[in-house]
């Protein structure tokens, strides 16, 4: 068994029966961890406190890896998370990007939208409409996963990753549709419904108009014939000031084109760029966290 496979086995075991001890054991002595809402990464000495608070605040928490890919020293894991709040079951999707040292986490970062989770502690803050993104892994079964030592990296890079990343350096809205199959769909956090391929050019025109100077820089990626993860740093102007946002895209592929593209980022981080009150909201383990009124 390869180191990343040993890690994934332990990660999945934690998800089935979460405990502070099992979680801490996933981390290297030099590890760092960053979740949405954290001001900066925490070290291994703070990991136990984080997960203890999170498990207390989110009873019956479970974590099921659905899709994954490994490349170099990095594994991406897309997972369905579930818990209970005041006796009510909740679920939300996430992507965890993990740089490994052997079979332990050296640098871990979580990508998900805190909005729906934190709104469970204050129902008046829930989304007014349907959030299609929050339910996208409902009913998903582990095994559509890809573990990715198959050597298609060069062709995948040349036919999809490189040209897609190049288009984000100076975005051409019409070009984005070329990376999708005609009947594909794209989902971002907060979308009430998926967008079809034909709708993508107009969506990106509006996004670029609202965010002057918008561009994305590729940080890491891992892929296989049917699955691709890309981590990005987005930069652009909001309110006349430069802003940055980290995010991950997951693409389901068919012949080097996407049949589904899903973005993972934190909408509260976007809100905090315009609303100082939102910047004070903590991570999901923070019992003082509340959405701004």
Language model: regions and residue ranges:
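A beta-strand edge to alpha-helix "cap/lid" segment located at domain peripheries
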Residues: 55-152, 205-293
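A general structural-boundary detector
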Residues: 10, 34-37, 85, 147, ...
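Short acidic-aromatic low-complexity motifs
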Residues: 1-26, 142-179
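A solvent-exposed, acidic/Ser-Thr-rich amphipathic alpha-helical stretch
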Residues: 6, 13, 20-73, 173-226
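Hydrophobic alpha-helical core bundles mediating ligand binding, dimerization, or RNAP-core interactions
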Residues: 8-11, 27, 51, 79-81, ...
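Soluble or luminal CAZymes and related metallo-dependent hydrolases
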Residues: 3, 46, 156, 199, ...
């Amino acid at each position: 068994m390869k180191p990343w496979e040993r890690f994934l086995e332990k990660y999945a075991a934690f998800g089935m029966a979460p405990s502070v001890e099992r979680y801490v054991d996933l981390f290297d002595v030099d590890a760092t961890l960053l979740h949405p809402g954290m001001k900066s990464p925490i070290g291994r000495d703070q990991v136990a406190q984080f997960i203890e608070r999170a498990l207390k605040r989110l009873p019956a928490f479970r974590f099921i890896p659905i899709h994954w890919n490994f490349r170099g020293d990095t594994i991406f894991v897309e997972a369905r998370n579930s818990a209970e709040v005041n006796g009510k079951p909740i679920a939300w999707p996430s992507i965890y990007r993990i740089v490994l040292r052997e079979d332990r986490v050296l640098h871990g970062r979580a990508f998900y939208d805190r909005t729906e989770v934190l709104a469970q502690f204050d129902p008046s803050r829930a989304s007014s409409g349907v959030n299609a993104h929050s339910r996208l892994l409902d009913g998903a079964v582990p095994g559509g996963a890809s573990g990715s030592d198959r050597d298609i990296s060069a062709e995948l890079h040349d036919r999809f990753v490189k040209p897609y990343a190049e288009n984000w350096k100076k975005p051409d809205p019409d070009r984005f549709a070329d990376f999708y199959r005609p009947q594909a769909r794209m989902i971002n956090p907060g979308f009430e419904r998926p967008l079809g391929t034909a709708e993508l050019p107009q969506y990106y025109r509006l996004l670029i108009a609202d965010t002057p100077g918008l561009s994305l820089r590729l940080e890491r990626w891992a892929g296989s014939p049917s699955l691709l993860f890309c981590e990005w740093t987005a930069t652009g102007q909001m309110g006349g000031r430069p802003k940055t946002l980290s995010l991950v895209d997951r693409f389901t592929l068919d012949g080097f084109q996407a049949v589904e593209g899903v973005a993972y980022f934190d909408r509260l981080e976007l809100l905090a760029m315009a609303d100082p009150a939102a910047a004070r909201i903590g991570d999901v383990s923070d019992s003082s966290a509340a959405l701004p009124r």
